[in-house]
Amino acid sequence: MVLVRKIRFEDLDAVTKIEADIFHQPWKYSDFEDMVDKSDRGYVVIELDGRVIGGAAYRNILGDVEITNVELEKEYRGNGYSHILIEEVIKEGKNSGGESFTLEVRKSNLAAIHLYESHGFVTEGVRKGFYDFPKEDALIMWNRNAN
């Protein structure tokens, strides 16, 4: 069974490990801890049969919701779970007063770009050399009409 919900303290070890397995410069335990029970930012986890397999972080800045992290264990990619996460982040972002949504994505991450485009995001800019390991540009994507 799939369940998507807000992060709880008991999820911190799992999401910290997922983050460390995916990113070269992962968030720390304390970064995720700061997402629990906040009104202007949050983190949603996705569980499969009671086990956390991924999540997504967001923060509301004066009505613009920035999606800062989307992560899913590699073996669960390509099964629609990322779509569920994006839908939940948009819902939670709207609940926090968000009107527009933005994110950055590696220019080479075509799977993620297609995911975001399928949820109404369009590329509106580029941050040159934004990412390290390897150095790469970031596309700045926006969804200004989230339904």
Sequence positions of predicted segments:
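Active-site acidic-Proline motif in GNAT/NAT acetyltransferases
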Residues: E73-N79, K107-N109
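Conserved active-site tyrosine of GNAT-family acetyltransferases
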Residues: Y116, F121, M141
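Acetyl-CoA-dependent GNAT
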Residues: L3-E75, I86-E88, E92, S96, ...
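Short coil/turn segments at alpha/beta junctions that flank glycine-rich nucleotide-binding fingerprints
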Residues: N79, S96-E99
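Conserved hydrophobic beta-strand within the GNAT/NAT acetyltransferase core sheet
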Residues: I67, F101-V105
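Conserved catalytic-core motifs of GNAT/GCN5-like acyltransferases
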Residues: E104, V122-A138
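Conserved acetyl-CoA-binding loop-helix of GNAT-fold acetyltransferases
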Residues: G78-K91, H114-S118
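Short glycine/proline-centered loop/turn elements that form peptide/ligand docking sites
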Residues: S82, I86, N109-A112, G129-P134
